[in-house]
Amino acid sequence: HGPHHIMDILCNYHNWDIQWGNHDILWMGAAAGNDICIANVVRFVTRFGNTGVLEDGYGINLLPLATFAMETYADDPCALFGLRPVPGETISNPKTLRLLAQMHKAISIIQFKLEAETISRRPEFEMDDRMLLHLIDFERGIITINGKEYPMKDCNFPTIDPKDPYKLTDEEKEIVAKLHRSFVGSEKLRKHIKHIFRNGCMYTITNSNLLFHASIPLNADGSLKEIEIRGKKYKGKALLEKVGHLIRTAYFAEGDSEEKRFAMDYVWYLWCGKDSPAFDKAKMATFERYFLDDKELHKETKGHYYTLRDKEEVCDMILDEFGVVGKHRHIINGHVPVKTLKGENPIKANGKLMVIDGGFSKAYHLETGIAGYTLEYHSRGFQLVQHEPFTSMQKAIEEGQDIKSTTQIVELSSQRVMVKDTDKGRELIAQINDLKKLLEAYRIGLIKERSNKY
């Protein structure tokens, strides 16, 4: 149970490739030492009851956070921070459930404070709307957003000073420092993250297929949106390449240069920033979803890419931008789970786009109705395999169950693709031609045979 087991297998696998998504980048940022990324990762494991991933999988010590949370919220039921239900997984021990809720609340408040520090330091991120603690009237239990008052579902914040709401307490600073040391010092996490760097990037092109995780930021008219990074504008392919460079700088750059510091901050921006190609939504409404009932405030308006990608001409424009050629060329996407329960189709733009995020995570099974997709590519074309939820290996053995899958033919060609038609085939042909030229040069005497004298 947990991603560390999968990463152990991948680290020993001879050939694999990954296009980084927002969750990958969050973990990469945490491993690099970005404290907001660390807080987010810890928040997720407490939210879903997966603390074993950090403690057992990566040797990260959560005891200081647990001790602090128990003391700080001893009289607080932390009702808003209960475990998010996951199909097939339950924690029945009430003491464990209470401790997880306390830890969840404690790290969430720390996260909001840390975010404010970066937002203030980087006005170019334009994320002032994510600083909300100073808008709370703690005595009345309300918050004022855009001139309108909303009741808070919880207003018990013993670590927040209303006069200086974003200041970390001394205990919180100590917890942040200890978590930082644990993440940066985890040998196993370092090994796994380095493999993700070695075998991954923001996008890849293979056999006339363009693969990227989430989005290519677009304007309302379908043109590529220019994103300014440190005074220079980037769009399309150049944007993804710049972003990839910044992620590597954040992790690998030595010293404490301004370039390194900016890259570290930008890695967090990629997780939740409005112009991030790994996110591309107006906001990440974490605070609102926890503390406010008004569903309008929960909305995370998607960027134009998510609506315009259904148009074939938009997909063609993006494929042209990345230099993808071929009669059968496609964009292969993930990020947004395909809600098959609502009749959503993973094949879009007349077959030009395939969205293969069906929600492998159990937390999404109830939302999507399935347990993910696998896209298979072979000499005849594409087929999409839709998986049904898998309960457990033990149940599969006892009841003779297996992973149930449904196969859908996406694209079938009457003429089989030969090895020579693939990227690898073209590479082999180029090598063969080079060898032929070398042989010809030897035959006509341009290359002399050397005699070895001993």
Report residues per predicted region:
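Feature recognizes metal-dependent phosphohydrolase scaffolds
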Residues: 1-454
